[in-house]
Each structure stands twice: as C-alpha cells, then as structure tokens.
Amino acid sequence: MSETAESPRRMPGRPRSEASNQAIIRATLELLIEVGYGALTMESVRTRAGVGKATIYRRWSSKEELVSDTIVFLHEEFEAPDTGSLRGDYEALAGAVRASASRGGAAMLMPRLLGESVHDPELFAIFRANLVEPRRAALRSVLERAVARGEIREGLDLELLIDLFAGPAVYRLFITGGDMAQMFSIDAQMDALMNGLAP
C-alpha cells in the first residue's frame, strides 16, 4: 500500500464483510494512483485486495461504481462553516479542504483523476459529482451568506465567484506545484478578492 494512503473510513450501510470491503477500497485507491483509471480493472483490484470475484461483484457491479465509492471515501462531504464573516468562513473551509487533500493519498490521486477525466466523460462525471460539486456547494453557501450579511454586493455571479475563490488552489496544485498544507496566503487572497467584491 502507498505510504501516503490511509485506511479508508468505515463504509456506509451494512456491508457483508467490512474487512473485505475496506481491502477492496484500499486496493482501488492504490491502483488509481499507480496505473490510473483507464488501466484499472475489477480483476486487478480483486487480485490486489485478495478477495474472490463474488465478493467484489456482490457490492460493485462495475468499475465506475467502485471508483465512485472510492472517491467518496477519500473525499468527504464538507459542511459550510458559519463563523459570522466571509473571511472566517472561507479560512475554515479552505483549511478543511487542504487538510483533506493532504491525507490519505488525495494529493496524489487528484491530479491523476483530473488528467484522465479530460478524455473520459464517465470518469469526469464521477469526479465532478463526488469531488467537485460537494466543495462548490459548501463554498456557494458561504458566499450566499456573505451576500445576505452585506459583505458582498448583490447581483454578482456566484458561480464565477466560486471559480475565483477556488482557482488559485487548483492552479497551484496542478500547474505550478506546491505543498498542499501551505498553498498560499489566504489573507492575501481574501484582501485581493474583497477589494473587488465589497459593496
């Protein structure tokens, strides 16, 4: 197993074999990092996990379902923080996202998935639904509250604002490279953004 990958969290529902299911998820994560989505097969996961064919197909009928569940385990849902200010909310949310990406192999997996998803509509749909949208939803709630508090002027395109807030971290991670634990100064980013967003 990759040294960066932690054991997955407990699976939802009532799995027939928790140990087998976690072994399958760990194997899927390792192979996604090592060979990518395109080369990953149910058989390779089964072999790596050391389980029988019936065990893996009893819960996952396809590679898409298995990878989707693996992404869900690795990238947890985020609740929108409510500290009373946009700066406080964004700092809390950004900290949670960075901490998540820095553990469990996420920082290694995300560039691999993003690169392959450009040419694979099915993978892109999984990536967007399970990784991108939950984070956008949390940030959207943060921005909506900021508008309600009068910190951001009304009438702005919130989807564009989400891109502006999230863009620097994505660019630093995938283009210029950097430590996920210390990507950039959130204070500096907030100062630059608020100069253009304040009423």
Protein language model annotation of sequence segments:
Residues M1-R48, E65:
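Basic, helix-initiating cap at the start of DNA-binding domains
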Residues M108, E122-A148, L158:
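Amphipathic alpha-helical packing segments from all-alpha helical-bundle domains
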Residues T70-I71, A101-R128:
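Amphipathic alpha-helical segments used for helix-helix packing
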Residues R153-I175, I186-L193:
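Hydrophobic alpha-helical segments that form the core
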Residues G50-W60:
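Short hydrophobic/aromatic patch on the recognition helix
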Residues I24, A39, S62-V67, E77-F78, ...:
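Short amphipathic alpha-helical segment with a characteristic S/N-K-E followed by hydrophobic residues
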Residues M1-R9, A92, A99, A137, ...:
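C-terminal peripheral helix-coil segments that are non-catalytic and often amphipathic
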Residues F78-M110, L161:
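Hydrophobic alpha-helical connector segments
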